[in-house]
Design a protein with these regions (language model features):
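Pyridoxal 5′-phosphate
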Residues: 1-355
């Protein structure tokens, strides 16, 4: 077991080479300009907390505004609330319509000279809605604001190019793309990352330390305090190799076929309520059936061999917008089949008949 960036011996050099090769793999995958723009974290949650803490310290003061959307994961809401308590800025929220489509007219009205940053999921983890983040980023930039994309639910399902999006930050997690847990990525434009203070202090993120002063390492290392999960980053690189070998365009088409098939079959059930019906959504279907509690649906489906998610899905403000406490959610990946969906439907119909 040899640490990275710390030893001159062969094992450390080999570990470092694998770790930095993974960084280059991520850079290429996202089409970032430089590996200096790729920061390894513990996941999307830590990436968002890093931006919230460091961006707020560098740029936000009382009277400034940050915009989020009603469909954000708690990880893109709570860190901003915590930062707001310290720095005194205002948090604004973009609403959506009943189909799960962001209200871009309301978004345009929220943008003003006080807006410093807009934070938006590219894909809702609840609704499957694919948000027009490229257009939204352009609108933010026209208003003089930066734009952050939560890519946790998009990066595994279709190609994401940070140059095309022209986003200032993008985050995602390895485990969402068939990699290991506990590893994530923060992409940030180099010039912007240079302006942000470190998120944590410790080993390897420093250039020189005295009791009077500390100078920090160059990018991206000033944001990577302590021993990184260099085994996990190598696993992430392997996962990227895997999805690119399959083909992200092929994955997107396959999952779209599965989603259409599943929604058509599920609509056969009386009192089926879908949440998120915007055309072109990704392979996430959130639903309720009549007055059946989603926890009951999930428990009984589990006994029949089907694993679904139930509850508020780390999106309680979105649940409130939809007028429910929770939902059941079924999702599909590249390895699922239409036959599995048909067998899921048999199980779901059996469960519904119990009530």
């Amino acid at each position: 077991n040899a640490n990275v960036h710390r030893g001159i011996h062969m094992l450390s050099q080999e570990a470092t080479a694998l770790h930095e090769a993974a960084r280059e793999r991520v850079r290429s995958f996202l089409n970032a300009r430089s590996t200096a723009e790729i920061v390894f974290t513990r996941g999307t949650t830590e990436s968002l907390n890093l931006v919230a803490a460091s961006f707020s310290q560098a740029f936000l003061r009382e009277g400034d505004e940050v915009i989020v959307t009603v469909m954000e994961h708690h990880s893109n809401i709570v860190p901003w609330q915590l930062a707001r308590e310290r720095w005194g800025f205002t948090l604004r929220v973009v609403p959506m319509d009943d189909e799960g489509r962001l209200d871009l007219e309301a978004y345009a009205a929220l943008l003003n000279e006080r807006t410093r940053l807009v934070c938006c999921c590219q894909v809702s983890n609840v609704l499957g809605t694919v948000n027009p983040v490229r257009e939204m980023a352009r609108m933010a930039h026209d208003a003089g604001a930066y734009f952050l994309v939560d890519g946790a639910q998009s990066v595994p399902h279709f190609p994401v190019d940070v140059q095309e999006l022209d986003c200032d930050f993008l985050t995602f997690s390895a485990h969402k793309i068939y990699g290991p847990t506990g590893v994530g990525v923060l992409y940030g434009k180099e010039a912007l990352l240079e302006q942000l203070p470190p998120y944590q202090g410790g080993g390897e993120m420093i250039a020189r330390v005295t009791f009077e002063h500390t100078t920090f390492e160059r990018l991206p290392f000033k944001f990577e305090a302590g021993t990184p999960d260099y085994v996990g980053t190598h696993g992430l690189a392997a996962a990227i190799d895997y999805v690119e070998a399959v083909g992200l365009d092929r994955i997107a088409v396959h999952e779209e076929v599965l989603t259409r098939h599943a929604m058509a079959r599920m609509a056969e059930i009386d009192q089926m309520q879908f949440y998120g019906t915007v055309p072109g959504k990704t392979s996430v279907i959130s639903f309720n059936v009549g007055q059946i509690h989603p926890m009951d649906l999930g428990t009984l489906l589990d006994r029949l061999g089907f694993a679904i998610r139930t509850g508020h899905h780390c999106a309680q403000p979105l649940m409130a917008r939809c007028g429910v406490e929770g939902m059941a959610r079924v999702s599909f990946a590249l390895y699922n089949t239409e036959d599995e969906i048909d067998r899921f439907m048999e199980a779901l119909q059996r469960v519904v008949r119990m009530f």
